[in-house]
Curated annotation (Swiss-Prot):
Belongs to the SecE/SEC61-gamma family. It comes from the Archaea. This is Protein translocase subunit SecE. The keyword Nuclease does not apply. One of its GO terms (cellular component) is plasma membrane. The gene is secE. It comes from Methanopyrus kandleri (strain AV19 / DSM 6324 / JCM 9639 / NBRC 100938). Gene3D superfamilies: Preprotein translocase SecE subunit. Pfam families: SecE. Essential subunit of the Sec protein translocation channel SecYEG. Clamps together the 2 halves of SecY. May contact the channel plug during translocation. Keywords: Cell membrane, Membrane, Protein transport, Translocation, Transmembrane, Transmembrane helix, Transport. GO terms for molecular function: protein transmembrane transporter activity. Component of the Sec protein translocase complex. Heterotrimer consisting of SecY (alpha), SecG (beta) and SecE (gamma) subunits. The heterotrimers can form oligomers, although 1 heterotrimer is thought to be able to translocate proteins. Interacts with the ribosome. May interact with SecDF, and other proteins may be involved.
Length: 61
């Protein structure tokens, strides 16, 4: 398959996906924001705990 044919195939696939997609509702946006925010808080909390543990280890060694 040539590069041109691969590009045409990719564009067809993208077009098909975009046709099937729909704009999310406001409630779906809010739900996604809550989930993303929770994920950010969890990752930040884990990072904070690791930093505190490392500082405590350095303090007592």
């Amino acid at each position: 398959m040539s590069t041109y044919e691969e590009l045409i195939s990719l564009l067809r696939d993208c077009k098909r996906v975009l046709r099937a997609a729909r704009k999310p509702t406001w409630d779906e946006y809010i739900e996604s924001a809550k989930i993303a925010g929770l994920g950010i808080l969890i990752v930040g909390g884990v990072g904070f705990l690791i930093r505190v543990i490392v500082q405590l280890i350095e303090l007592y060694t």
